[in-house]
Amino acid sequence: MFTGLCAFPLTPLHQQHLDEKAFIRILSRLTDTGVDSLGILGSTGSYAYLNREQRKRVVQVAKAHVGSIPMMVGVGAIATSEVLRLVEDAQQAGADALLLPMMSYQPLSAEEIFAFYEEVCRHVSVPVCLYDNPRTTHVTLADELQGRIAALPAIASIKIPGLPEPQASERVATLRRHLPARVTLGASGDALATAGLQAGCQVWY
């Protein structure tokens, strides 16, 4: 599922609850266009502002309406224990993959970041996409560290920030040297998707 177009829907809310009818309409518009996969509860889906029960319901509704289209679910949280609970919820609801950013209140060392991904990957039964999003998380992952994380068997893809050319080609080529061949790269951001794909990314996230 880590190739092609992975569409990330908004999560519409009404009075602090998921607006299920509006959400289903959004999902239907995406599935009707023939996207390759869906990214539920990404940054576009406002995952950081939803509690566990809200997230669980979002995933349940999505799974019931996406048919055979693969579904990746964001499980980002500050506490590792909460991430593991979200992982369990997403997998039980039928997630086909997990989107995992590094979120932290305190600055972390490279070893601490690696240990986090290693621990989470011990508890997954589906592939994981490493979410490199320093602008939002304020956590910068060095290329060497991303390479170490990507070597974990559960890691299948990396979502990186989009860049314009020629920076996109330079970024993809540099990062690719640190990654196993089986791990795909995907660019995020609508405006920069073309540059990312032309630079060698296999996915438009």
PLM regions with names:
Residues 1-140, 148:
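Active-site beta->alpha loop and helix N-cap motifs at the rims of alpha/beta catalytic domains
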Residues 122, 134-205:
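Catalytic alpha/beta core domains of metabolic enzymes, predominantly
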